Amino acid sequence: MEEKLKIEYTIISRGTEKYGSKGYMGISEVKKGKRYFVLSKHYEKEVKTLKDSFEFDDIYNIENITLSRFEIIPKITLDNKKDFINKRIIICGLGNVGFASLIYLLDLGYKEIDILINNNEKYVNDAIMQLNQRYNAKISVVTTLSTYNTYIEATGKSNIIKEIIENITENSSIFLLGTPREGTYLIDPLEIHRKNINIFGGHELNGHSWQNRNSCFIDLLKKNRNKELKKFVNIYNEKPNIVNNVLQRKNNFFEVIKYDI
C-alpha cells in the first residue's frame, strides 16, 4: 500500500466485542473515487493493511455499506442451499447478523418469517412494521421456540441451539450463522442422527475465496443501493468513550462510529 489511507468509520460488532474484540470492521476515506472495507480496530487512524479488504466505488452510502457487509454472511451461506430453505422459517436473534439475514430472505421472496428475541424494543417493532409494509410480508415476533422447518441461528448461544435440536422435526435444516463461543455445548448427536437434521455452518471466511467474498459484497451493494436504510443504522460522531457508551445499550440494528479526518 503506497499511500496511507485514513479510516473514516468503524462498525460495532457486538457478537465479537462481547468476547474482547476491539472491533475489526473499518471503512476508509475516499481516495480516487474508491473506498476500502478493511480490518480495523476502533480508534485506529490509518489503514494498516489491505489484506482481506474490499474495494468499491464511492457511490454507496454508509448505511448500505454496513448492511451489505453483514449480509455477506447469509448470502454466502444460503445461496447454494436454497433447496434446504422451507417456507416455515424462524430467525433466532435479531442482532447484526440476524437482521441482515432477515433482509436477505425478504429479498429472496420469503414472506412468512418468525423472529425469536427476548427484548422487544421499540426500534425492533417499528422496523418489523415497516418491513411488513414494504415487502407485503408476515414477520412476527415470538418468545418461545416451536416447530419449524428452517432455523436461522444468529445468536451463537448453546441453550438456543439445544432448544432448536429438541424442537426440530425430521429432515429440517439449521443454519448456524451466529458464532458459538461459550465453550460448553449441549447438543445430543443422537438427536441429529435420529431426526436426519441438516446442519450448515455459516462462517464467512473458511472455505470461501477472497474473490468470492468480494464479489458477494459488490452484488449486495448494488442490490441495496436504492433501499431506505437510515432508520436501521445509527451513526455516532467520535468522542471520548463513545464505543463503550454505545456498547452499554443497543439502540438500533447497526451502530457506526464516524471519525474526524
Protein language model regions, located:
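Glycine-rich beta-strand-centered segment in the early N-terminal region that forms part
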Residues: M1-E44
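NAD(P)H dinucleotide-binding glycine-rich loop of Rossmann-like/cofactor-binding domains
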Residues: I27-C92
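Short, acidic/turn-prone active-site loops that include or flank metal/cofactor-
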Residues: H42-Y43, I59-N61, N118-E121, G178-E182, ...
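Mid-domain Rossmann-like dinucleotide-binding core that forms the NAD(H)/NADP(H) cofactor-binding site
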Residues: N64-L145
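Glycine- and other small-residue-rich loops at beta-strand/loop junctions that grip anionic moieties
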Residues: I90, L94, L116, I152-A154, ...
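Glycine-rich cofactor phosphate-binding loops and adjacent beta1-alpha1 units
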Residues: N125, M129-N198
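C-terminal substrate-binding/catalytic core of Rossmann-like NAD(P)-dependent dehydrogenases/reductases
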Residues: Y185-V233, I242
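Phosphate-binding loop/pocket of nucleotide- and phosphate-handling active sites
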Residues: K258-I261
